[in-house]
Amino acid sequence: MPEPQEGETFAFQAEIAQLMSLIINTFYSNKEIFLRELISNSSDALDKIRYESLTDPSKLESGKELFIKIIPNKEAGTLTLIDTGIGMTKADLVNNLGTIAKSGTKAFMEALQAGADISMIGQFGVGFYSAYLVADKVVVTSKNNDDEQYVWESSAGGSFTVRPDSGEPLGRGTKIVLHIKEDQLEYLEESKIKQIVNKHSQFIGYPIKLLVEKEREKEVSDDEAEEEKKEEKEEKKDDEPKLEDAEDDEDKKDKKKKTVKVKYTEDEELNKTKPIWTRNADDISQEEYGEFYKSLTNDWEDHLAVKHFSVEGQLDFRALLFVPRRMPFDLFENKKKKNNIKLYVRRVFIMDNCEELIPDYLNFIKGVVDSEDLPLNISREMLQQNKILKVIRKNLVKKCLELFEELAEDKETYKKFYDQFSKNLKLGVHEDSQNRQKLADLLRFNTSASGDEYCSLNDYVGRMKENQTQIYFITGESIDQVKNSAFVERVKKRGFEVIYMTEPIDEYVIQQLKEYKGKQLVSVTKEGLELPEDEAEKKKREEDKAKFENLCKVMKSVLESKVEKVMVSNRLVDSPCCIVTSQYGWSANMERIMKAQALRDSSAMGYMAGKKHLEINPDHAIIETLRQRAEADKNDKAVKDLVILLFETALLSSGFSLDEPGTHASRIYRMIKLGLGIDEDEPMTTEESSSGAAAAAPASGDAPPLVDDSEDLSHMEEVD
């Protein structure tokens, strides 16, 4: 046996070292998932070499047979997994097994510490490290076509070594040797390995072979029998001596021939099940679908729903699609590999990251598509232009929407689905004009009439009042915020239902979804809100417009370019005023969302931010008193300051942010001082403030007038 060559030692990246420490030092009951993860990694490696060989058959010259082999060795206490996949170069071993953390490493540790199941490990891309659940030392030997054979080795002590391997050549692929912990030796038992493979990996697309020990009867002569017995005795040492002696006595009586039991090893294939998607859907149980789903996705939970169908005619393909129970942690990451649908051609795996197969908004759907018509050696470039693929994609979208409609028939199941994937449906409304109305049917919202229950747009339309022609909605940060908003006061008081849209993506939905079933969607936060009115209400509104026309002009002259116009409102009940935006600009909520974008286009803020309109409530005491003050003296500086204060407060209550919050705060503090009767022109010492506070307060409970009696000046700073 050749001497092992000297290797290089590397430290594990900090997050990986933490993860390994967590795996090793925490008790987990379902350690068996380590085998599922290693088999899944082997399957991925085999997929890669098979895909490369479609365009370059010479890639398989280093080993044509594609398989996974498991070898338990009780004497040595090791479990070995061998695959003939693509293998790893030295750089792959160093980077992938220790020095570069996957994006999921930290997320998985956080999930674990929050009480998540260890079996989630594969979903976070760190399944290899689950080997340390049962092993105290792992040795990985790997050979890639582009490099020499290397060995990676670690006992998880914070570092690993990589060295060239001059041992038995693999040809191509990877061999993982797990040195099993003393308390985990059950994983070397044939029955245990078979049980785990059957449970987790029976639908892997490559043969999984287990090296098993068997016995057979063999007829031998006396001399050969003696030789066999001697060998057995040496192997068993002194176990069962009396039984051996008795058998020896019997052997001596047989003078010519003897039948003996001979032990031998052979490979036994553990996954002979034919691909589940090629079978008739009526013959497949929910348990079988569940096992296949878990094998396909490494999910630890059952799927929520499944759609199994075939299309025949001009185009032949079969598909099996699953909806998971929960959203993946990295569902909307830009650099996330789209690998949820595996593409097969005539049962041969082609690729698992075919972006042309399904639109982005359905990227949570997992499954298999098997085409009879695509060429086996199709390249990525050809796929982009392929008409067959476009037809397959159209059918997949159609079947997914059918599946969601079926889910919607059961309220509870649909709520589970919607809580996880509502953003995807809304993204679909924004992106998929062809299926926009079908997707709109699937949307659910809270409304002013639905309480805690979700409500569909169809339900809303069904409850609309006879004289109601529009669908009213409001966007905002939270249910509590929009529920108590000034904008919904009049609409709710008149008995009209308002839809509450509180997710940032809702703003994008309504940019595309202008109407539903012939009813226009109208934001109660924008100008142009028209509520059905009778003649008396119309008459009162005209009178209010005339009565407050002068105040509107005064307020506009004070606020200048801060608002486009000031007008009498038909939407307010309890609030004195509010800020609405122009029909085609951003709402306050959209402006907030855009300001939060790290890579936003600042120039867009100027022309997309909606023009602000200040609406005043003619029935509110503050507005009526302000009108009287303005009528008495339109140059009253107190009126000017109060208008600015009202405007800034309305900005905040309407969902906008202040450009100068410091100035607004100073203005509020001055109002508080006025309310407490403190003369801000006189500086106060601490002693004076403590002894004279009571004397400074006015005798009556009323706050002092804003304008000083001796001077026609406001104590509040005049703001240009």
UniProtKB/Swiss-Prot annotation:
Source organism phylogeny: Eukaryota, Metazoa, Ecdysozoa, Arthropoda, Hexapoda
Keyword Membrane: no
GO CC term (a single one): protein-containing complex
Biased composition range(s): Basic and acidic residues: 227-244
Note on domains (UniProt): The TPR repeat-binding motif mediates interaction with TPR repeat-containing proteins.
Gene Ontology biological process terms from the UniProt entry: cellular response to heat; protein folding; protein stabilization
A single MF term (Gene Ontology): ATP hydrolysis activity
Amino acids binding ATP: N41, D83, K102, F128, R380
SUPFAM superfamilies in the record: ATPase domain of HSP90 chaperone/DNA topoisomerase II/histidine kinase, HSP90 C-terminal domain, Ribosomal protein S5 domain 2-like
Region of interest called Disordered, as start-end residue ranges on this chain: 217-258, 681-720
Function as written in the Swiss-Prot or TrEMBL entry: Molecular chaperone that promotes the maturation, structural maintenance and proper regulation of specific target proteins involved for instance in cell cycle control and signal transduction. Undergoes a functional cycle that is linked to its ATPase activity. This cycle probably induces conformational changes in the client proteins, thereby causing their activation. Interacts dynamically with various co-chaperones that modulate its substrate recognition, ATPase cycle and chaperone function. Required for piRNA biogenesis by facilitating loading of piRNAs into PIWI proteins.
Protein name: Heat shock protein 83
Composition skew (Low complexity), residue ranges: 689-705
Protein family (similarity comment): Belongs to the heat shock protein 90 family.
Subunit-level organization: Homodimer.
Statement: the UniProt record of this protein carries the keyword ATP-binding: yes
UniProtKB keywords: ATP-binding, Chaperone, Cytoplasm, Nucleotide-binding, Stress response
UniProt gene name: Hsp83
Signal peptide extent: none
Intervals of motif TPR repeat-binding: 716-720
